[in-house]
Each structure stands twice: as structure tokens, then as C-alpha cells.
Amino acid sequence: MENSTTTISREELEELQEAFNKIDIDNSGYVSDYELQDLFKEASLPLPGYKVREIVEKILSVADSNKDGKISFEEFVSLMQELKSKDISKTFRKIINKREGITAIGGTSTISSEGTQHSYSEEEKVAFVNWINKALENDPDCKHLIPMNPNDDSLFKSLADGILLCKMINLSEPDTIDERAINKKKLTPFTISENLNLALNSASAIGCTVVNIGASDLKEGKPHLVLGLLWQIIKVGLFADIEISRNEALIALLNEGEELEELMKLSPEELLLRWVNYHLTNAGWHTISNFSQDIKDSRAYFHLLNQIAPKGGEDGPAIAIDLSGINETNDLKRAGLMLQEADKLGCKQFVTPADVVSGNPKLNLAFVANLFNTYPCLHKPNNNDIDMNLLEGESKEERTFRNWMNSLGVNPYINHLYSDLADALVIFQLYEMIRVPVNWSHVNKPPYPALGGNMKKIENCNYAVELGKNKAKFSLVGIAGQDLNEGNSTLTLALVWQLMRRYTLNVLSDLGEGEKVNDEIIIKWVNQTLKSANKKTSISSFKDKSISTSLPVLDLIDAIAPNAVRQEMIRRENLSDEDKLNNAKYAISVARKIGARIYALPDDLVEVKPKMVMTVFACLMGKGLNRIK
């Protein structure tokens, strides 16, 4: 490494840092093979899939010196030196520089290298501003902020008090934040920080990656961080119903001879692509394989709009789509005419004609998702061969685990807990996060061969179980790699819970000078803290029935952060089920507001789910110890 950096000028180092930041989509400080693959896809480089894989494999083989499946900035610098004279480097640099509409700003964060540049997309900013303006135009709490001007930097200033972010989170995942916990009037720097903590910890709880974002970054309106977080929040809302268990009409997208189980493994992006192609096939038009290169001429969109527009009758009054714009010779004008037709359906959000013609994949994906949510135009087939038992949605516990993993920035994103863990890649990433070393040379990585691919995944799962038993010292009695690969829910959850538990306890051990923390220590600390604050509540275990009132949690928050809890919001006597739920909603939101990263749901407190209850008290203990320090 020493030798390779001596020949790099400061200017070149800055250029490389900028390139690295563009590829490092999740801001993890590392670039994974998935991010490299995404880069080629996003750049709309007309390369066949095998060529992309070849280049990615070459890059990893050259750059990944410690074989951990990802590239650090130092490894990236070495790589670019090594590839300088080769064709692959030219291709690679061409892709990085191909991202247009990019505004570069100097890096100011204390963790960013001196002189780095973070870039953000002007198009994304405009699209998000217009979407938020429309979504919150009638919210009285946002009157002082909305409408924002899409053509200046008002977005970054308007998000600085945390109110808009909290509102957007609730739009994407209703009831995530208890509105009573949002500070709305006479804001001070402290109450603004509380709002931003509430937004960040709530975003984390719905599966957004927030590992490198702090309240101060949002307060300062750092564009690349703000836009990255906003996109994640908006995407959660756009994709909420693109899920077969929540929208059975999607079964209509089954291909000839395909099992429902296979369709259920598809990500929302893949389902959207299939939905578009379903309608294009019905229109007699050729199918597409992406939301960038293939939609640039707008013609597929014209046919899609014509297929999904109401025809009268049950769908409501007919809306006629004018297809004459297909014959327009100018791409930009054709895209403009197409968006005029989309506007008839009330769905021209997210893209401008230029975004369509440039093939902006993120904004075109959002445009299509919004079309799907408004006019899916699918009818559930009357097919008796389909096993409807498969359509049971995920449990609240499964969703919590999935959101926890995604919030930590695992790659790939987990859409379906069991099928997306079938190759154990994400489990290995979680092991690393709980400080269980993974020997990446033992791990098979995608793309898996068509023949024997599942064996490669099972080998990974066997290694994951072996690490759990021998290195992490988990209790994994009766669990084999095949159970993970097949998505055995009970056994997979047993491993995932132990990963989450260890992660939570590690945070506490770090605060307590490394001493091992267990349930007894947490319970003892909770009771001592409650007693020293003269509270009447206490808990005997994480199964204590009094937890269903949420009063021990609220009293503990008050002991740790006096004045955070507004006592008039709490019911203490003769609690109905509704009162208990309201207390729980308030408790979870106020805990997040004081900085506790809690993934549990209000129902976990009301129903006294001991595992999730433990994580709530552990996170609050972490917050309490942090304050003392």
C-alpha cells in the first residue's frame, strides 16, 4: 500500500475519494460487490451481464487484499493504481464519471477525509421536494415549511427542525411515530435535536440505514445525507403494498408453470418490472429489463399508461390516453407528451422529461411504483391450484428483525426474511458486526451457478451455523445449515434473535468497560434507577405483567431524561386496552426521542413479549449509562 500511494497527487486522491463516495451508496465506508454491480447497472453501460460480473470479479480479485468481500478506500486507491493502464480502468472511470446532474460540495464532516467531496443529484432534490409538497400540503403542522421551492436549497433548511422528517416517516409507515412526542412549538436547539433523534431512530426502526448519519448532519442540512435518508423513507412508503401477502392481485403476475413460492421471493423492484412487462405484453409491445436504458424513449410508458388507465365501469370514469405522442421524433418532447398523459391519471410525480430521457433509474423506479400504487389494474386469478396458506404475511417479530438488519446497512437489502437469508451472506455480515470473525475465503459469493448453486448456498449456511456454535457460542441445538437454506422459520428466528441480542448487549458492554451484561444486570439497573428517582414502578423480569401498561418504561425514561415525558399524556389508573396501547406508543416514541435506538413495537410492550421487552430496557440502560459518562 505504501508504494502505491507515493505516486498519487493530492488532486488525484481527492478525485478518487469522490469516486469512492459515489459508489459507496450506503455510506458504510466500504464498497461491496453488490455496490459495484449496482454501479454498472445504474450507469446504463451497455454491457452484457456476464461482462459486468467479469469486471466486478476482476476488480475484487485485484483490490480485495484481505479477502473480506469488500473494498476499503485504501484498497480502492491501490486498485486504481494497478488498473491505471488497463482497459478495465477506463471502463470503470467512465462509469463513475457518467453520473450526470451531480452537484459536488466539499466534505465537512469530522469523519470525512480532509478535502473530500460529496455529491448529490439536483434531479433527486427536485423530485423529493415536489413529492413532499404534495404529500404534506394539508398538514397544519407543516404550514411554516410547505410548499418548499424545488429550485433552491430550501429542502435542506426545511428538514432541519425534524418535523417534516417525522411526518414523512409516518406517511411511509403509519403510526411509527406518536405525534404527541414531536416537538412542534417554540422550538429550541435542544427540542430540535430531540425531533431529529426521534426521526433518525424511527427511520432505523422501519429499516432505513442510518449508521453514518447524526442529528447534527440533518440540522446542518448536509445534502448527500439528507437525500440518502429521504430516498430510503420515501421508498418504504412506495413499496409498502408491492408485497404479495398485502396485495393478492399480484398473483396475476405468475408466469406459466411458475410456483407461487418463487414469485414471493421477488423484491419489490423485480415485481414492479414484472408488472410493467405484464401490461406491455397485453399491449403487444416488447418487454423491458430495467428502469433506465429501456424506458428512455418513453414508448413503453405510453403503452403502460394506456393499459392501466380506467376504461369506465367498476374502475371509475374512463380516462382516454392519447398515444399519438409515440410518433414524436424528439425524445425530450416525446417524454413531455407522455408525462401529460400520466398527469391525466394524477401520476406525473418523480420524473421530468429529462429524467426519463437520461434514464435516471432511481426516479423512474419511483415513478413506476407510484403508477402501480394508484392504478395497479390487476385482478386476482380464480386459480384453485394456488396454495393460499403461503400468503400469510410476515409476523411483527419477523418484520422487526428484518428492519433491524436493514438499518445496519446489510447488503443485499432484506425484503423477505427467510428467502433472503438462504445463502447466509447477510448472516456473515451480522457476525462481523457482533465481532465474530468471518473467514471470507470460506464463503461462496453470488452470482451462483445454475447447476449446483443451491449447494454453494448450503455450504455457506453450514459455515454460518458452525460459526454460531463454535465462535459466537450461541445455543443452536438441532439447527443445521439446510434449515437456514430452506427458511425453517423457528430455527432461523432462533439464530437471528441471538444475533440481535448479542448486538444489543455488546453496546452495553462497551459502555460498561467491557464487563459482560446479562438479563439480571439489566433488571437490577432498571430497578435501581427507578428507585433512586423515587418512582413507584419496578419489574421482576421481562415477563412482568406490569410492563403491559408501559408505566415502568415511561418512568425509566423520566428518570434518565427528566422532562422528556409529558405526564399529562399518560394514563395510570383503570387502563383499558386502548389506554395501554396509547401508553406504549408514547413510550416507544419518547424513548427514541431521547436517543434510544429501539426496534420494538408498541404491541411488544402491551403483549409483554420478553425478547423485545429486553431490547427496550437494554437500549434505555445504554442511554442512561451514556448520560452518566
From Swiss-Prot:
Lineage: Eukaryota, Metazoa, Chordata, Craniata, Vertebrata
SMART domains assigned: CH, EFh
Tissue expr: In small intestine, colon, and kidney; relatively lower levels of expression are detected in the lung and stomach.
Entry's disease: Deafness, autosomal dominant, 76: A form of non-syndromic deafness characterized by mild to profound sensorineural hearing loss and variable age at onset. Sensorineural hearing loss results from damage to the neural receptors of the inner ear, the nerve pathways to the brain, or the area of the brain that receives sound information.
Function: Actin-bundling protein. In the inner ear, it is required for stereocilia formation. Mediates liquid packing of actin filaments that is necessary for stereocilia to grow to their proper dimensions.
Pfam family, one: CH
Any one biological process term the GO annotation gives: regulation of microvillus length
Modified positions (N-acetylmethionine) in chain numbering: M1
Gene3D superfamilies referenced in this protein's UniProt entry, alphabetically: Calponin-like domain, EF-hand
Source taxon at top rank: Eukaryota
Region (Actin-binding 2): 381-625
Listed name of the protein: Plastin-1
Assembly, per entry: Monomer.
Key word Acetylation present: yes
Keywords from the named record: Acetylation, Actin-binding, Calcium, Cell projection, Cytoplasm, Deafness, Disease variant, Metal-binding, Non-syndromic deafness, Phosphoprotein, Repeat
Region (Actin-binding 1): 108-380
Any one GO molecular-function label of the UniProt entry: structural constituent of cytoskeleton
Main location: cytoplasm
Organism from which the protein derives: Homo sapiens (Human)
Processing after translation: Phosphorylated.
GO cellular component: actin filament; actin filament bundle; brush border; cytoplasm; cytosol; extracellular exosome; plasma membrane; stereocilium
Residues covered by the Calponin-homology (CH) domain: 122-238, 266-376, 395-504, 516-625
CDD domains: CH_PLS1_rpt1, CH_PLS1_rpt2, CH_PLS1_rpt3, CH_PLS1_rpt4, EFh
